[in-house]
């Protein structure tokens, strides 16, 4: 048996270090309807184990009855149930450890039907066989631009609504095919 050998320098034991990595399974923009659920998911890694923080519009997201955060050793998920318009915003996730940080984001838009146009309807021109109306757009477009207005008319003494147009993008419309002396009701 020989004599033991000694190291020439002291050795320091330390954990393996790897900067965080982040791969999101989402696009940069996500549109959902009011009442629908949505989730933002991805995978991450790093040593030491990274800290995960979710944000909405730069404010830390907290779990509640509709918002859930799940983190496993390799995956992340932020889920929102029964979305409301106020859930719209820029969501981001930060994965960080002592070696650095990574950030991913997604712009979420929660859309709904627009509110009705602002009244009253203005009768710009009135003729014996037609009139021209105008109105103001809705105060709330539902989260996306109004693509068309549906205008209908009816004789004031009947229950049957007749379409005037369903393709108007303007806030003005000519209502044709009227009978002189009759009263009409219009809805937009």
For each predicted feature, which ranges?
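Beta-strand-rich modules
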Residues: 1, 174-188
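Surface-exposed loops/turns
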Residues: 34, 46, 72, 85, ...
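Exposed aromatic-hydrophobic patches
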Residues: 41, 77-81, 136, 172-177
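Extracellular Ig-like/FN3 beta-sandwich strand-entry sites
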Residues: 37, 47-49, 86-90, 101, ...
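A short beta-strand segment in extracellular, disulfide-stabilized domains
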Residues: 36-44, 120, 131-136
